[in-house]
């Protein structure tokens, strides 16, 4: 049975061209890029090329790219660097729907005397810019907001947010882990000060990422040690990973326009057909301002985990939320922040596509989903009894 992988917001397949680019740096070119000898110099050149490739994808200067190990490190580094550079300011603004790499850092900072404002979202997952405006003060050191939500695909009005942030003199950090490669970016014309990306979301290996730091932004490094990355991130460079990220960035820039069109078409077909064939289901999130590859659909009166297990029997991989919170018994914090009823958020499934997704794969999901939902609803003692279903959920949670 072949795998139908529709969980690309969790991670992606490494592109074969990326694998080919990496292999020599795992076997033949194994020196240290900081070494003075020719062997080390060859690796230094490879790192510089990769930096240029990543910069081109972001519309940035290569001097503004700092290689990291992942998106989580990038988020941590950006947040803490901004605060270390402005010790007199003790206020942070973020949203209720951020990735744990941002939310949990902010929660920890609250225990260290910082005040954090968590902006709310509406039923479509969008921010109220007036709430942002009212929250900004002279004491605000940092505003950290994701470009696009990893669970719903909702895209925030980043440049409008950035204009308001800059008017108040705060640093603006954006987690663009889900947006890069799906939305064209140009840091040269952007209001963003720092931006995080992660390799494994754009068909590069796991364990490599990058942080964009605008020239002139005060930056205090998270990792202290050697001189690597111009003193902004200590530690011997992961050359195979960096080369892989560079090649992946080059390929994303080549494919981005065709990928956006293809993924949008396949996503819309999947979404519209399921909504037409299956009663009591709805799309979660903004249906206009969103990523081209992502749909999050709530199937009422059944559990998302049961849907995923049923899909898995057909070799179909999807998600009920962020892979970084999948071990939690609680429903998605993103969908809860949107105020969705429990009958919807407990049965919500995210399908996330990529440039490798095919028509035949979408056809297969469309074929099996109606039967899965019908069977699971038939097994439910409450079916479409919303009050009874909610009571059963509360009792289940109380005994866990």
Swiss-Prot record:
Gene Ontology MF, one: iron-sulfur cluster binding
The residues the record assigns to binding [2Fe-2S] cluster are 324
Q: Which UniProt keywords apply?
A: Iron, Iron-sulfur, Metal-binding, Nitrogen fixation, Pyridoxal phosphate, Transferase
Fetch the SUPFAM superfamilies from UniProt: PLP-dependent transferases
Which metal ions or organic cofactors does this protein require, according to UniProt? pyridoxal 5'-phosphate
EC number(s) on file: 2.8.1.7
Q: Which domain of life is it from?
A: Bacteria
Q: Name one Pfam family in it.
A: Aminotran_5
Record's signal peptide: none
Name the Gene Ontology biological process terms.
amino acid metabolic process; nitrogen fixation
Which chemical reaction does it catalyze? (sulfur carrier)-H + L-cysteine = (sulfur carrier)-SH + L-alanine
Task: Kindly list the positions annotated as binding pyridoxal 5'-phosphate.
Answer: 71-72, 150, 178, 198-200, 236
Q: Is Ubl conjugation set as a keyword in this record?
A: no
Question: Is the tRNA processing keyword given for this protein?
Answer: no
Miscellaneous note, as given in the UniProt record, is: Belongs to the NIF1 gene cluster which is expressed in heterocysts under anaerobic and aerobic conditions.
User: Subunit structure of this entry?
Assistant: Homodimer.
Instruction: Return the similarity comment.
Output: Belongs to the class-V pyridoxal-phosphate-dependent aminotransferase family. NifS/IscS subfamily.
Q: What does this protein do?
A: Catalyzes the removal of elemental sulfur atoms from cysteine to produce alanine. Seems to participate in the biosynthesis of the nitrogenase metalloclusters by providing the inorganic sulfur required for the Fe-S core formation.
Give the protein's recorded name: Cysteine desulfurase 1
Q: Please give the organism.
A: Trichormus variabilis (strain ATCC 29413 / PCC 7937) (Anabaena variabilis)
């Amino acid at each position: 049975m072949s795998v139908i992988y529709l969980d690309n917001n969790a991670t992606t397949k490494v592109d074969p061209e990326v694998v080919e680019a990496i292999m020599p740096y795992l076997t033949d070119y194994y020196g240290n890029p900081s070494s003075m000898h020719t062997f080390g110099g060859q690796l230094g050149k490879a790192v510089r090329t990769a930096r240029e490739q990543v910069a081109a994808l972001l519309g940035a200067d290569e001097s503004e790219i700092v290689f990291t190990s992942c998106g989580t490190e990038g988020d941590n580094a950006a947040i803490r660097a901004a605060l270390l550079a402005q010790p007199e300011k003790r206020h942070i603004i973020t949203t209720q729907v951020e990735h744990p790499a941002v939310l949990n850092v902010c929660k920890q900072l609250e225990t260290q005397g910082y005040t954090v404002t968590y902006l709310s979202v509406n039923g479509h997952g969008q921010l109220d810019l007036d709430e942002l405006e009212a929250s900004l003060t002279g004491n605000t050191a940092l505003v950290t907001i994701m470009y696009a939500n990893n669970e719903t695909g909702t895209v925030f009005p980043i440049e409008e947010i950035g204009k308001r942030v800059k008017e108040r003199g705060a640093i603006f950090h954006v987690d663009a882990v889900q947006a890069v490669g799906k939305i064209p970016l140009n840091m040269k014309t952007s209001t963003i000060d720092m931006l995080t990306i992660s390799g494994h979301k754009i068909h590069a290996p796991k364990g490599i990422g990058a942080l964009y730091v605008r020239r002139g932004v005060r930056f205090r490094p998270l990792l202290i040690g050697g001189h690597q990355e111009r003193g902004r991130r200590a530690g011997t460079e992961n050359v195979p990973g960096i080369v892989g990220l560079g090649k992946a960035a080059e390929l994303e820039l080549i494919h981005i326009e065709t990928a956006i069109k293809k993924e949008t078409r396949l996503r819309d077909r999947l979404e519209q057909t399921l909504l037409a064939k299956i009663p009591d289901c709805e799309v979660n999130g903004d249906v206009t301002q969103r990523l081209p590859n992502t749909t999050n659909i709530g199937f009422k009166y059944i559990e998302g985990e049961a849907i995923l297990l049923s899909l898995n029997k057909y070799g179909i991989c999807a998600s009920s939320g962020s892979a970084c919170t999948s071990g939690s018994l609680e429903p998605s914090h993103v969908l809860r922040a949107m105020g969705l009823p429990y009958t919807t958020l407990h049965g919500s499934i995210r399908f996330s596509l990529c440039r490798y997704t095919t028509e035949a794969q979408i056809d297969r999901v469309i074929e099996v989903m109606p039967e899965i939902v019908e069977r699971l609803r038939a097994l439910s003692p409450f079916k479409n009894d919303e009050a009874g279903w909610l009571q059963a959920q509360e009792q289940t949670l109380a005994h866990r």
